[in-house]
Each structure stands twice: as structure tokens, then as C-alpha cells.
């Protein structure tokens, strides 16, 4: 169902710390112009962890209404409280978004059987297509390929965003899961290998500033134009690397502000901005790479 370049959209904020909805509108226009496949709202890159429940709902509703069916919208859910998740899903059921991305439960250290029943229980509360989000570094919880494959046979669980960095899992999940189960790369830097092994797309942080390049790269790989894909990948590889200079979303928010996509680089605590050395290194990379994305569209 979901393929190609899905942007993990940042959440722009004013200097006061309030949500900057005008900048969100500009970002949506930027992604429509540059052929982004879908928008993931309030994921890790969207600072889900620092937003109130009310803010999360307002942001998703605004993005959904602004997109006006021109581009699919997926909402991120990061929680370990299943009742809070049900409450959030109930809101998303009312606005009929295209998908929900749900992380594995953090901190609680569940067994694989516990993880299976967790996602199974959540799936009973909605018909919205559900994507599992595996990011063991962030959550301390790792869903194994065998568990993913079992979950793939639940009707509305349609894919996984995998940020485990273990590329050997891609073929295992693809082989044992139901047909057309969607494997989405969760780390930009691994996109080339991940998709060549059977992935259908990427949920991309970098796409916030290289929407055109990211969508082009996915299209080239899916069409098996591997030489052109590798050429494009290695042209933007340094950008993928520099985005790892500090915890996400600090680097990408700075870059969006530097390139004029958002008005401020404000980020909520406990995240903090880049230091002078990191900014110098980032500017050097941005000056080196010739971006084709239509940034002046907003």
C-alpha cells in the first residue's frame, strides 16, 4: 500500500514553542510539488515525545485537512500505554487518515509473545492500515522477524518500518510474511541495500530537505535502474551521514531553517540545538551537494 519516499515530517515551532501551522502548510506544498509518496506526521522526527495529546491530534487533523487527499497522511503513535493508544486511534478513526505507524512499547521490556499480543489488541480497534515501527535503539524493545511475520497475517497490519539496522532481516520478513507486506526502511543511510533486498520504500528524515532526490531514488530502485540509483545515492550520502551528527530531529530541523523551509529551528527540551562545530560541518556538506528539490515553491 505504501511505497516510495514517505517523509517523516518535522514539527515546526515558533520561538515561543507553539506549533507553527503556517510553516506546516508550506512543508506540505513542498512535498506535493516534489512527488513525496506520503507524509508521516508526529513520528520521532516530528517530536511526538514532546507533544501533548491535544497538540498531536491538532497537528494530524491540520495536516490531513491541508493535504486534502492530494497526498496520503500517516499518523505516528509512540506509547507504551495501550489505553492511551486506543484513545488516540479513536480520534484518527473519525478523520479517516490513510495509516497509523505504531512503535513497539518502550521501557517495559516485553517478550515477543507480549509484543505480538500488544499489536494484535491494537488492531482490533481500527480498520486503518497499521504499520509496525521497530526502533530498538530508541525504545529498548526489538521485534524479531518471526513475530513480524506472524503479525503480517492480521488483516490491517500492512507493513513495518524497520530501524534495527540489521539488513539480514529484510529477506527473512519478506519470505515468511503475507504477500505484499510492506517493508519500509527506517534509516536513510541504508535505503539502497534495504530496498534492493526487497524493501518497497523509506520513511525518510532526509526527505524534509531532499524530497525530490528521495522520491527519485526510490523510483529508480523500484524500477531496477540500479546504476542510476547508486549514482544518486552516493551523491547524497554525505548528507545522510551528517544528519547523524546529533540525535534526530535536531540536525534536520536546523537544516530546514537554514534552507528557509521553516521560520525557526526551535526544538523542545530535552533536545537542544547544534553547536558551532556541528553547524560548520553541516554547512560544508550543504554547500557541496547540489539539491534539485524545489525549495522555492513555498
UniProtKB/Swiss-Prot annotation:
<keyword id="KW-0963">Cytoplasm</keyword>
<keyword id="KW-0028">Amino-acid biosynthesis</keyword>
<keyword id="KW-0456">Lyase</keyword>
<dbReference type="GO" id="GO:0008840">
    <property type="term" value="F:4-hydroxy-tetrahydrodipicolinate synthase activity"/>
</dbReference>
<dbReference type="InterPro" id="IPR020624">
    <property type="entry name" value="Schiff_base-form_aldolases_CS"/>
</dbReference>
<feature type="site" description="Part of a proton relay during catalysis">
    <location>
        <position position="107"/>
    </location>
</feature>
<feature type="site" description="Part of a proton relay during catalysis">
    <location>
        <position position="44"/>
    </location>
</feature>
<protein>
    <recommendedName>
        <fullName>4-hydroxy-tetrahydrodipicolinate synthase</fullName>
        <ecNumber>4.3.3.7</ecNumber>
    </recommendedName>
</protein>
<dbReference type="InterPro" id="IPR005263">
    <property type="entry name" value="DapA"/>
</dbReference>
<dbReference type="InterPro" id="IPR020625">
    <property type="entry name" value="Schiff_base-form_aldolases_AS"/>
</dbReference>
<dbReference type="GO" id="GO:0009089">
    <property type="term" value="P:lysine biosynthetic process via diaminopimelate"/>
</dbReference>
<dbReference type="InterPro" id="IPR013785">
    <property type="entry name" value="Aldolase_TIM"/>
</dbReference>
<keyword id="KW-0704">Schiff base</keyword>
<dbReference type="GO" id="GO:0019877">
    <property type="term" value="P:diaminopimelate biosynthetic process"/>
</dbReference>
<feature type="binding site">
    <location>
        <position position="203"/>
    </location>
    <ligand>
        <name>pyruvate</name>
    </ligand>
</feature>
<comment type="subunit">
    <text>Homotetramer; dimer of dimers.</text>
</comment>
<keyword id="KW-0220">Diaminopimelate biosynthesis</keyword>
<dbReference type="Pfam" id="PF00701">
    <property type="entry name" value="DHDPS"/>
</dbReference>
<keyword id="KW-0457">Lysine biosynthesis</keyword>
<feature type="binding site">
    <location>
        <position position="45"/>
    </location>
    <ligand>
        <name>pyruvate</name>
    </ligand>
</feature>
<dbReference type="InterPro" id="IPR002220">
    <property type="entry name" value="DapA-like"/>
</dbReference>
<comment type="pathway">
    <text>Amino-acid biosynthesis; L-lysine biosynthesis via DAP pathway; (S)-tetrahydrodipicolinate from L-aspartate: step 3/4.</text>
</comment>
<dbReference type="GO" id="GO:0005829">
    <property type="term" value="C:cytosol"/>
</dbReference>
<feature type="active site" description="Proton donor/acceptor">
    <location>
        <position position="133"/>
    </location>
</feature>
<comment type="function">
    <text>Catalyzes the condensation of (S)-aspartate-beta-semialdehyde [(S)-ASA] and pyruvate to 4-hydroxy-tetrahydrodipicolinate (HTPA).</text>
</comment>
<comment type="similarity">
    <text>Belongs to the DapA family.</text>
</comment>
<feature type="active site" description="Schiff-base intermediate with substrate">
    <location>
        <position position="161"/>
    </location>
</feature>
Amino acid at each position: 500500500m505504501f511505497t516510495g519516499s514517505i517523509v517523516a515530517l518535522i514539527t515546526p515551532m515558533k520561538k515561543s514553542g507553539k506549533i507553527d501551522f503556517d510553516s506546516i502548510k508550506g512543508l506540505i506544498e513542498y512535498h506535493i510539488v516534489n512527488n513525496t509518496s506520503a507524509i508521516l506526521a508526529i513520528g520521532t522526527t516530528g517530536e511526538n515525545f514532546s507533544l501533548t495529546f491535544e497538540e498531536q491530534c491538532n497537528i494530524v487533523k491540520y495536516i490531513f485537512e491541508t493535504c486534502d487527499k492530494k497526498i496520503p497522511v500517516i499518523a505516528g503513535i509512540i506509547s507504551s500505554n495501550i489505553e492511551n493508544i486506543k484513545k488516540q486511534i479513536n480520534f484518527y478513526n473519525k478523520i479517516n487518515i490513510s495509516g497509523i505507524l505504531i512503535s513497539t512499547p518502550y521501557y517495559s521490556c516485553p517478550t515477543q509473545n507480549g509484543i505480538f499480543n500488544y499489536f494484535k489488541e491494537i488492531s482490533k480497534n481500527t480498520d486503518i492500515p497499521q504499520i509496525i515501527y521497530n526502533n530498538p535503539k530508541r525504545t529498548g524493545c526489538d521485534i524479531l522477524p518471526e513475530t513480524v511475520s506472524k503479525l503480517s497475517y492480521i488483516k490491517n497490519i500492512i507493513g513495518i518500518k524497520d530501524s534495527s539496522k540489521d539488513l539480514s532481516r529484510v529477506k527473512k520478513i519478506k519470505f515468511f510474511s503475507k504477500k505484499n507486506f510492506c517493508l519500509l526502511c527506517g534509516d536513510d543511510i541504508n535505503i539502497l541495500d534495504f530496498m534492493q533486498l526487497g524493501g518497497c520504500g523509506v520513511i525518510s528524515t532526509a526527505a524534509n530537505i531532499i524530497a525530490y532526490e528521495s522520491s527519485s531514488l526510490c523510483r529508480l530502485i523500484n524500477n531496477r535502474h540500479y546504476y542510476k540509483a547508486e549514482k544518486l545515492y552516493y551523491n547524497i550520502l554525505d548528507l545522510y551521514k551528517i544528519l547523524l551528527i546529533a540525535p534526530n530531529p535536531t540536525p534536520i530541523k536546523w537544516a530546514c531553517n537554514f534552507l528557509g523551509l521553516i521560520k525557526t529551528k526551535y526544538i523542545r527540551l530535552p533536545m537542544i540545538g547544534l553547536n558551532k562545530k556541528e553547524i560548520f560541518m553541516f554547512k560544508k556538506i550543504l554547500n557541496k551537494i547540489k539539491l534539485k528539490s524545489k525549495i522555492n515553491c513555498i
